[in-house]
Amino acid sequence: MRMTTSFTGSRGVRYPAPDVARGFMLLLIAVANVPSWNKMPNGAEPPVSSVDGWWMFVRTLVVDHRAYPLFAMLFGFGLMTMINRRIASGTQTYLASLPGAAEGREPMPHEAAWAREMATIDAYRLVRRRGWWMLLIGFVHGLVFPGDIIGAYGLVAVLLANLLARKNYSALYLTGGIISVLALATYLASGTLSGGSTLTASGEQSVSLTVALLWVVTNALQWAVVLVVQVLIALIVPAAVIGARLADTDLLTHPERHHRLLISVGLGGLVLGALAAFHGALTLATTVQLWPWDFAMTEFFGLAGACGWLALLALYAGGPRPDGRLTGLRRLASAVGRRSMTVYLSQTILFGIIFGVVPLLVTGRRLWMGQAAAALVALGVWLACVVLCLLLERGGHAGPFETLLRTAVARSERRRPTPPPPPAVWPGMQPGMPPVAQPGVQPEAPVQPGMPPAPQPGPQPAP
């Protein structure tokens, strides 16, 4: 079974590094998200053992505020890859529709430019449709988990679709830079920023319709607030821009060609991110007091840590194999990475069952455990998703949510009339001159007002 080919054969080779990186990234996301579910029933501050404290120290250095920027970079990479493929295939389709193309006529420069422009518009519309559907999926997911990230990525796709399709990197860099400065200023001013968490009511929780409805409504409001925060004053947009730019290089498609650079970025990024978060992490395991800028350092330099993770994971995955096969952990991670939305949403389902549904039905209270034990639960949830993906892989199936998104995007496309290519402009032609006939094409005689049309070639009636 080929492991690097996409589910739709027309898309061609699918390089392993992005998929392997997504697969391991989802483990980091599970570890980063599980504290949002692991809440004490009465809302009190949970006791922290020494094991929990040192685990949170390690998690802050290498996981927290690194997983989601990594996710955003891979999302931007995927969007630009989709755009590139759509423009390439669409350009050929439009060129094939030109008169004489079937007979081997070479397109003129203005026709080639027209075909590429039409394909670019199609790619822009595709990204926007995908973004709107992701926003809807994110809203539904946010009713259960207001820290959802799918909606934020969908909104980024909608807002940046035109700039991405036209590869306007100057505007993209400017947008990412402005948001980075705004984010840093916000972190320094506030000292803390909530990433969204599940709601826990005070006192004993009971399974009642009123509580359930209040929980859903509150989650929806939190999701809307978190959505704006994630897009405007988090580092999702800068990370997505970096990922989109990477799609126009071979750093991820052929990492074997860039060993020295990727090793430098990988180790340097992880070390820089860890150093920036070190003091803040130390406060979780010792009696060291928190500095006002600790959160800003951890969050802002989390992007450096995410770049480090991506570089090392790309090196580990390597380039495409001659036989298209992956083995071992690469095979497992790739199977998960190619079904990233399904795995991400499945994690929410499993966390909800483990920490909420079953304990509430059995004891009437949410489940709570130590942070280190919760991390083991996150690992177990990720492994369960790995098994699911391997079963889908064996059957040759995409993830159900990937299929749902792909189907929704395809069926929501509106058919629009294709404008004809602009008339040719030949060298030496002056404004107002009639177009010069192309070789082998009979030009039409101009019709003057009040004159009958010129007779057409062919048999004439007898006098």
PLM region descriptions:
Residues 2-426, 437, 461-463:
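Alpha-helical transmembrane segments and their immediate juxtamembrane cytosolic regions
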Residues 424-428, 432-440, 444-446, 450-462:
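Intrinsically disordered, low-complexity tandem-repeat regions
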